[in-house]
Amino acid sequence: MAPRSLYLLAVLLFSANLFAGVGFAAAAEGPEDKGLTKGGKGKGEKGTKVGADDTNGTDPDPEPEPEPEPEPEPEPEPEPEPEPEPEPEPEPEPEPEPEPEPEPEPEPEPEPEPEPEPEPGAATLKSVALPFAIAAAALVAAF
């Protein structure tokens, strides 16, 4: 059985590799992306920095809206006179059956859009999985 210090060293290496991998992925995004921005993803535009006093477009002290004035009740209308009964209509002639319409041709399926290329410096599967693989190898080697 290996000494306890080797187990602790393996756990330390595992943790260090994970934190380093996350740090490298965050650093790859670039210094201009640090901090919160409002506006979300746009068409290549950067969002504006969120300040401490920013209320996300809402007024912190809204003015109360004036209450609407009650409308006067309308006067009741006189009841209309009953209409005389209409005469029964003659039975309509049966319509000839329409010819069935030919089925429309199915539209060709649009070509699937190609996957967009990742932004330069964005975290990829390789940049995230590499620290996990190194840390796992260190754990296996220690035990």
From Swiss-Prot:
<keyword id="KW-0732">Signal</keyword>
<feature type="repeat" description="31">
    <location>
        <begin position="119"/>
        <end position="120"/>
    </location>
</feature>
<feature type="compositionally biased region" description="Acidic residues">
    <location>
        <begin position="60"/>
        <end position="118"/>
    </location>
</feature>
<dbReference type="Pfam" id="PF05887">
    <property type="entry name" value="Trypan_PARP"/>
</dbReference>
<protein>
    <recommendedName>
        <fullName>Procyclic form-specific polypeptide B1-alpha</fullName>
    </recommendedName>
</protein>
<feature type="repeat" description="30">
    <location>
        <begin position="117"/>
        <end position="118"/>
    </location>
</feature>
<keyword id="KW-0472">Membrane</keyword>
<feature type="lipid moiety-binding region" description="GPI-anchor amidated glycine">
    <location>
        <position position="121"/>
    </location>
</feature>
<feature type="region of interest" description="31 X 2 approximate tandem repeats of E-P">
    <location>
        <begin position="59"/>
        <end position="120"/>
    </location>
</feature>
<feature type="repeat" description="11">
    <location>
        <begin position="79"/>
        <end position="80"/>
    </location>
</feature>
<feature type="repeat" description="28">
    <location>
        <begin position="113"/>
        <end position="114"/>
    </location>
</feature>
<feature type="compositionally biased region" description="Basic and acidic residues">
    <location>
        <begin position="31"/>
        <end position="52"/>
    </location>
</feature>
<feature type="repeat" description="9">
    <location>
        <begin position="75"/>
        <end position="76"/>
    </location>
</feature>
<feature type="repeat" description="1; approximate">
    <location>
        <begin position="59"/>
        <end position="60"/>
    </location>
</feature>
<feature type="propeptide" description="Removed in mature form">
    <location>
        <begin position="122"/>
        <end position="143"/>
    </location>
</feature>
<keyword id="KW-0677">Repeat</keyword>
<dbReference type="InterPro" id="IPR008882">
    <property type="entry name" value="Trypano_PARP"/>
</dbReference>
<feature type="repeat" description="10">
    <location>
        <begin position="77"/>
        <end position="78"/>
    </location>
</feature>
<feature type="repeat" description="19">
    <location>
        <begin position="95"/>
        <end position="96"/>
    </location>
</feature>
<feature type="repeat" description="20">
    <location>
        <begin position="97"/>
        <end position="98"/>
    </location>
</feature>
<feature type="repeat" description="24">
    <location>
        <begin position="105"/>
        <end position="106"/>
    </location>
</feature>
<dbReference type="InterPro" id="IPR050972">
    <property type="entry name" value="SDr-like"/>
</dbReference>
<feature type="region of interest" description="Disordered">
    <location>
        <begin position="28"/>
        <end position="125"/>
    </location>
</feature>
<feature type="repeat" description="8">
    <location>
        <begin position="73"/>
        <end position="74"/>
    </location>
</feature>
<feature type="repeat" description="18">
    <location>
        <begin position="93"/>
        <end position="94"/>
    </location>
</feature>
<keyword id="KW-0449">Lipoprotein</keyword>
<dbReference type="GO" id="GO:0098552">
    <property type="term" value="C:side of membrane"/>
</dbReference>
<feature type="repeat" description="16">
    <location>
        <begin position="89"/>
        <end position="90"/>
    </location>
</feature>
<feature type="repeat" description="23">
    <location>
        <begin position="103"/>
        <end position="104"/>
    </location>
</feature>
<feature type="repeat" description="15">
    <location>
        <begin position="87"/>
        <end position="88"/>
    </location>
</feature>
<dbReference type="GO" id="GO:0005886">
    <property type="term" value="C:plasma membrane"/>
</dbReference>
<feature type="repeat" description="29">
    <location>
        <begin position="115"/>
        <end position="116"/>
    </location>
</feature>
<feature type="signal peptide">
    <location>
        <begin position="1"/>
        <end position="27"/>
    </location>
</feature>
<comment type="function">
    <text>Major surface antigen of procyclic forms.</text>
</comment>
<feature type="repeat" description="12">
    <location>
        <begin position="81"/>
        <end position="82"/>
    </location>
</feature>
<feature type="repeat" description="5">
    <location>
        <begin position="67"/>
        <end position="68"/>
    </location>
</feature>
<feature type="repeat" description="3">
    <location>
        <begin position="63"/>
        <end position="64"/>
    </location>
</feature>
<feature type="repeat" description="21">
    <location>
        <begin position="99"/>
        <end position="100"/>
    </location>
</feature>
<feature type="repeat" description="27">
    <location>
        <begin position="111"/>
        <end position="112"/>
    </location>
</feature>
<keyword id="KW-0325">Glycoprotein</keyword>
<feature type="repeat" description="7">
    <location>
        <begin position="71"/>
        <end position="72"/>
    </location>
</feature>
<feature type="repeat" description="25">
    <location>
        <begin position="107"/>
        <end position="108"/>
    </location>
</feature>
